[in-house]
Amino acid sequence: MRPLRPALLLAALLLAAPASAQGAPPDDDFRPGVRFNGLGRAYIQQADLGGTLMDTDTTTVESIADGEFVLDLAVGAQPNRSTEVQGVLRLRNEFGGFFGSGVTVEVRELWARGVVANAVEYRLGDMDLALTPYTVFLPVEDGRVNTPELFEPQKEVVYYEEFYTGFNERRFQGGRLDFGLAFDRVLSEVDVRAFLARIRPTDFTTTPTRLLGGGRIGATSPQIGPVQAEAGFNYVSIWDDLDSGDANEGIRNHVGTFDADVSVLRGDALAVSLVAEGGWSVAKRAERVDEDAESDPDAEPLLRETDTFFEAGVRAALPRQDLTLSGLFVNVGPDFFSAAAQSKRVDYARARSLYNRIGNDRDRRRVGLFDLTRDPAIYTFRTEQGLMPYDPRYNNALPYGRATPNRRGLRLAGVYEPDGSPVAAEVLVALLREIRGQGTEELKDFALVRAAADVSLAPLVGYGRGLALTLGTQIENTSRGGEPIEAVDLTSVLLEAGLTAEVYDRLDVLVGAKARTSSGRDYVPQIVDFNDVRDFPGPFVTDDGESLYGAGLRYRFGEDIYLTVQVQRYTYAADATPDDDYSIGQVFALYSMSF
């Protein structure tokens, strides 16, 4: 008997199901009209370069002062219950401008959204998207575990400028549809999402338009006893439209995955679920096909790579202990490539906004904790066509997040988050190994431990105002055996600590510190053609350390309105080159207002 195709089965289910509205605005709360909101920010700083390096450096400016004023005015209109549009106009002025000199005006955001027939949601223009960690996803940035409150204002600037929502979403321009269907039998509900976006425009010559499209179909089963299943199919495709320019070749990247979350035990003391995701990727470079010329239907693309991945495990929740535990086995193939999931937040090839080059030789300063904490210039939300460079001192086990290719092993996690308790904590442990050796048959082993804790000290010490402690650490080791030339042994430790104390009504004292040490050696490959290893430029050897610490005051005028004045100092030291040790001191004031 010929099996029933899944598409036909889905179509039959959709036809049999009554449509249900998703997120339609409540009738009682609707008021047509125009609203205004936005953000205002004033930022002024002075930075000074010092340390041993400056004893001989006669070319680098020791002190830099700059700043800016930014006003983002959002104008939104809702003429009826089912339609809403919004535009954000940015006015920016660099401090030092005179009578309008240095002022720029630009449109930062435009979108429209609404509901069709009280059932289908749509959005056009700027939009934020996330599916799963292997399809469309924005991994967390390097050099951060649990940011101290002292560094939060600068982190908020980075997140705002790069459209980071905090939910691992990527910013795109395009269109999106969402709708849900309810069922009386077989399934409880089905949710459908489809999207199409342009992620790169054409220059009408050698750079073609690059598009991204895909979607998700998710289904939820009725609950039968303790058992209930949620499953979904995710698909994302990135392709170059070669008809939009004169380019002779372009890329294609297709990723499809299935995910499932099956609850097998529900109780007051214990709830257990089985979780899994698996799929495949296709990455290829194809030539333009001339419609007037004869083409070979069996012709192979210029480059084609395919691979698979899967992760499967168990998640257990202990409600009485406010504890959630999970353990998964992970296998991500060496040639697995998913551009919309593996593109990093930090682009190490970008220029730093402060002291990009230092020393008499004008060497480019390596990205450090100082830049990772505060510099929007090195961050991006763009989707790249290949694996981006990374720094093994900050993230070597999972530089591209959970979708990092060529990894097999275990990922364990625990979250302790009780209601009303002064302590919350989480920990992640990853024990991984390469699937395929790079430049040798020997395989690297990766061990990663990441832990964070938030402690409300006020109830513990009897303090009448806010008093909070934040802690974070990341310990990472990479090792490989074999001959001396093959051997790898790199260890990095990152520590974070911060203290926030309200000393007067809405006046906070902020203290924070971050420190990293790294020692050992590794081989960092040069990547070409999606994720192919082209070469190893030589061993990456390091024995260095850096620290960033500071203190400041913050006055909260109201919710999302504050002024902070801070003093910070950053130091970098390498045992192999002590004459190049340097430090950067920074004093800044930041006023931020959301309205």
Residue ranges and their predicted role:
Residues 71-75:
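Histidine-anchored nucleotide/phosphate-binding helix
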Residues 106-153, 159-164, 168-171:
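Hydrophobic or amphipathic alpha-helical targeting/insertion segments
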